[in-house]
Amino acid sequence: KFVEITVDGEKCIINASAVQLVKPTDEGTLILFQNGAKIHTEFSFQELSNILLN
């Protein structure tokens, strides 16, 4: 499943199946992927969880 999120003001499409961990931070949410890549987004943990799980 691919989902669209905003990262640094840019729309990005990510493979939700490759997400290993979603971690809340003070500034938003950190997404860790199975390949070790990381993305920080301004979405709240709850918003991002809803996007990834729907």
Predicted segments — roles?
Residues 1-13, 17-54:
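Acidic, Ser/Thr- and proline-rich intrinsically disordered linker/docking segments
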